[in-house]
């Protein structure tokens, strides 16, 4: 760079002592020298010190210019980049892409350089090549056929045939749902004024649907309109979906009325009276041995409902343990429905006439389940013995709760241990004579505590 140019421009010296001019690129000689030193293997920091050029300038020339584009010429300052997508380059890119549709953009770029169509300064980048292929070589198919540029540049062996199976969209005036591109048209929502029109044209829509189904095999198939079904046709189609998949979950009113007709109240009352007559009281005393199963009367017909009126049982003894009950059926009902006091009358369950076999009726199955609940013990649980606060059972009563072969009712004959001797704890005499065994008599006295030790000082 001449010396007078430095004085004429707004120049100066950088941190390394090199001259520069504001707003002007680095001279071509310095740029070429930077590239030559880089080819020799000199590091960018050493190039910066030798040529007295800032490190940022060296990195930009090598990285952003030479290594990417292969050129060391400076870019245009104060203007846009020169256009690389010239008509000649676009035509060549189109020819390469038609000859080899799977050709990559970087391969097209290398071929442009190899054939001399572009040089290192005018060759388009990979992104520019992809943009040219996307916008100018491959045209979208929804454009008119006469104005499509791709059809003009196609080879004679490649032609585009329009599909006759695609029906053009109907005009907004003929669509009862409104404009196709409106919100109502896209969502399929009918306009307020179209309900009356659909009711008037229901016959025409049904005829149109039948004609379309008949002519679908001969002519081009038309799209099925969303308003082809009238309300008269939609009601029988929606009936199966309105039914409950689980009919027992919710009982309909008609189903309830039918069951009320099957079980009238006078018939239920007469059935309850017959059920009372079949119950015979039993005076069988309840034994103390609960391990043996008790026998209970079972109703012969499990489906005949009945109500039970139980009198107050007579207690034979004044102890807290009842020894006998007037009826064995009272035991069953007392266990199942423990909230009913003695002497109370169980009313007939006329409030639920349609669910006689499910709710509120005592049947033979209920008695059987009550007998299982009255068994000696529940599975996995020992017999209940009340605490001292609740009362106590005699030893004979506790022994009667289990089988006699398993436990003895007699008390233990030996006397309890008042003190535990070493002979009882260690029956083997060799353990007592072991050097590792220290008896309580041979143990030394405890060492004096800290307080005691300080007292002796």
UniProtKB/Swiss-Prot annotation:
Region (Disordered): 160-223
Keywords, comma-separated and alphabetical: Developmental protein, Differentiation, DNA-binding, Nucleus, Paired box, Phosphoprotein, Transcription, Transcription regulation
Record PROSITE patterns: PAIRED_1 (PS00034), PAIRED_2 (PS51057)
Alphabetized SMART domains for the sequence: PAX (SM00351)
DNA-binding region(s) in UniProt: 9-136
PAI subdomain: annotated span: 12-69
Localization per record: Nucleus
Chain positions covered by the region annotation RED subdomain: 88-136
Role noted for this protein: Thought to encode a transcription factor. It may have a role in kidney cell differentiation. May play a regulatory role in mammalian development.
Pfam families (UniProt xref): PAX, Pax2_C
InterPro entries: Homeodomain-like_sf, PAIRED_DNA-bd_dom, Paired_dom, Pax2_C, PAX_fam, WH-like_DNA-bd_sf
Residues with the Phosphoserine modification: 304
GO MF terms, alphabetically ordered: DNA binding; DNA-binding transcription factor activity; DNA-binding transcription factor activity, RNA polymerase II-specific; RNA polymerase II cis-regulatory region sequence-specific DNA binding; transcription cis-regulatory region binding
Protein's name according to its UniProt entry: Paired box protein Pax-8
Polar residues composition bias: residue spans: 160-183
Domain of life: Eukaryota
GO biological process: cell differentiation; positive regulation of DNA-templated transcription; positive regulation of thyroid hormone generation; regulation of thyroid-stimulating hormone secretion; thyroid gland development
Cellular component GO terms, alphabetical: nucleus
Predominant location: nucleus
Provenance organism: Pongo abelii
Assembly notes: Interacts with WWTR1.
């Amino acid at each position: 760079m001449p010396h007078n140019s430095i004085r004429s421009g707004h120049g100066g010296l950088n941190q390394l002592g090199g001259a520069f001019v504001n707003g002007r690129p680095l001279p071509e000689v310095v740029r070429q020298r930077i590239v030559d030193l880089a080819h020799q293997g000199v590091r960018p920091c050493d190039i910066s010190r030798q040529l007295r050029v800032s490190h940022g300038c060296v990195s930009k020339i090598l990285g952003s210019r030479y290594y990417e584009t292969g050129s060391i010429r400076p870019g245009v300052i104060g203007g846009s980049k020169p256009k690389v997508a010239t008509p000649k380059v676009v035509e060549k890119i189109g020819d390469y892409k038609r000859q080899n549709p799977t050709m990559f953009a970087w391969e097209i770029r290398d071929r442009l350089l190899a054939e001399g169509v572009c040089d290192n300064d005018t060759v388009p980048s990979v992104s520019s090549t992809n943009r040219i292929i996307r916008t100018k070589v491959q045209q979208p198919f929804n454009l008119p056929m006469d104005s499509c540029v791709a059809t003009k540049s196609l080879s004679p062996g490649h032609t585009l045939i329009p599909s006759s199976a695609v029906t053009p969209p109907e005009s907004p005036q003929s669509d009862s749902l409104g404009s196709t591109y409106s919100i109502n048209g896209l969502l399929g929502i009918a306009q307020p004024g179209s309900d009356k029109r659909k009711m008037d044209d229901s016959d025409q829509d049904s005829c149109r649907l039948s004609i379309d189904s008949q002519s679908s095999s001969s002519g081009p198939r038309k799209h099925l309109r969303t308003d082809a079904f009238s309300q008269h046709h939609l009601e029988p189609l929606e009936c199966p979906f309105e039914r409950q998949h689980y009919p027992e979950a919710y009982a309909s009113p008609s189903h309830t009325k039918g069951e009320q007709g099957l079980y009238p109240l006078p018939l239920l009352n007469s059935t309850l009276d017959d059920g009372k007559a079949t119950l015979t009281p039993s005076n069988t005393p309840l034994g103390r041995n609960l391990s043996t199963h008790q026998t209970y009367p079972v109703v012969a017909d499990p489906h005949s409902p009945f109500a039970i009126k139980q009198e107050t049982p007579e207690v034979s003894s004044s102890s807290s343990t009842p020894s006998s009950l007037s009826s064995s059926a009272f035991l069953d009902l007392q266990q199942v429905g423990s909230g009913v006091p003695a002497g109370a009358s169980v009313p007939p369950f006329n409030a639920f006439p349609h669910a006689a076999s499910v709710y509120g009726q005592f049947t033979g199955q209920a008695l059987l389940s009550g007998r299982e609940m009255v068994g000696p013990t529940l599975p996995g649980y020992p017999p209940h013995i009340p605490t001292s606060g609740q009362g106590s059972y005699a030893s004979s009563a506790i022994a009667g709760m289990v089988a006699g072969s398993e436990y003895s009712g007699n008390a233990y004959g030996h006397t309890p241990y008042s003190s535990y001797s070493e002979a009882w704890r260690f029956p083997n005499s060799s353990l007592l004579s072991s050097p590792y065994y220290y008896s309580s008599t041979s143990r030394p006295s405890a060492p004096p505590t800290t307080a005691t030790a300080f007292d002796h000082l």
